[in-house]
Design a protein with these regions (language model features):
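Structured, active/binding-site neighborhoods that engage oxygen-rich ligands
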Residues: 1-284
Length: 284
């Protein structure tokens, strides 16, 4: 999951709120594009980094509390500061040395997509009740609003539905409905804003329409808007389904511009998640 999220994120970042002309001319998965504002190219953003933070929390076996969640957000950022965060949240993180600092500094009233984008990895908790409660807890740290919480739960549960081999992609809406988080527009069209409802609706629409990771990324980016987040969410979920062809071009994998926290690191962390999942399932 994590390497796919990173590639989708880094690829989508090159088209984030770009012109339709740029998307039409270059959205073909042949190479990463530079971000229009920062010039960054082939580097993943906050979408991947925050999945890493929660993945490391899961793998550590620590108890989830607002402070432990916040600690992992701060520690992961401080060891590897990078772009993609909103200006306001980035300014807060720049001043934090601990989770306690973050909790004191932030007003968690956002309805944006930050809680959703970091939720695919929560599927590795391997238990529907635990997934729902942990989504609510982690969302409360930065996005303590009903829509943000529901978006987090929808993303993690959709990923779990595939990871547990319980159902198919086409059955995701029914599965989410059974958990009371089926409020999304599955026929989304046009740009996705940074709002949780938009990003979740856009990602799920594209997810239901495709069965190949390559076509999924292209379709997410083709919508325009917050392309890196929509692609990262959709691909994070899709990676959990055997019916999805894992056909991301090797060229994108090889040219991901990450050294310390690149593909090898992500694969090792993903292996730790699988070990944690097996342990959680054995306990159930």
């Amino acid at each position: 999951m994590l390497r796919q999220i990173a590639i989708a994120d880094a690829y989508g970042a090159g088209f984030e709120f770009s012109s339709q002309e740029k998307i039409d001319n270059h959205n073909d998965l042949t190479r990463y594009m530079a971000h229009d504002l920062t010039g960054s190219c082939g580097k993943y953003t906050d979408d991947t980094q925050m999945n890493i933070a929660l993945a490391e929390l899961i793998a550590s076996g620590e108890s989830w509390t607002p402070e432990t969640v916040a600690n992992h957000f701060v520690d992961t950022f401080n060891r590897d500061p990078r772009g993609g965060y909103s200006k306001r949240f980035r300014a807060v993180l720049d001043e934090c040395s601990s989770g306690q600092d973050l909790l004191k500094s932030i007003k968690p009233e956002s309805t944006r997509n930050g809680a959703a984008m970091r939720s695919p990895v929560i599927a590795y908790l391997g238990n529907e009740e635990a997934i729902r409660s942990h989504c609510e807890l982690q969302a409360s740290v930065t996005h303590n609003t009903p829509i943000a919480t529901q978006s987090s739960q929808a993303v993690a549960l959709a990923a779990y539905f595939g990871l547990s081999q319980t159902g198919t992609v086409a059955e995701i809406p029914s599965f989410l409905k059974s958990h009371g988080v089926n409020i999304w527009n599955y026929e989304w069209q046009g740009e996705s804003t940074v709002q949780a409802y938009d990003a979740c609706s856009a990602a799920l629409t594209c997810l239901l329409n495709c069965r190949q990771l390559s076509s999924l990324i292209i379709e997410c980016v083709a919508l325009g808007g917050d392309t890196d987040t929509v692609a990262a969410i959709a691909v994070g979920i899709a990676a959990c389904y055997t019916e999805y062809e894992k056909d991301i071009p090797e060229k994108l994998l090889d040219s991901l511009d990450e050294v310390t926290y690149g593909v090898a690191f992500l694969d090792d962390l993903n292996n730790q998640l699988h070990t944690s999942l097996t342990s959680n399932q054995a306990q159930d």
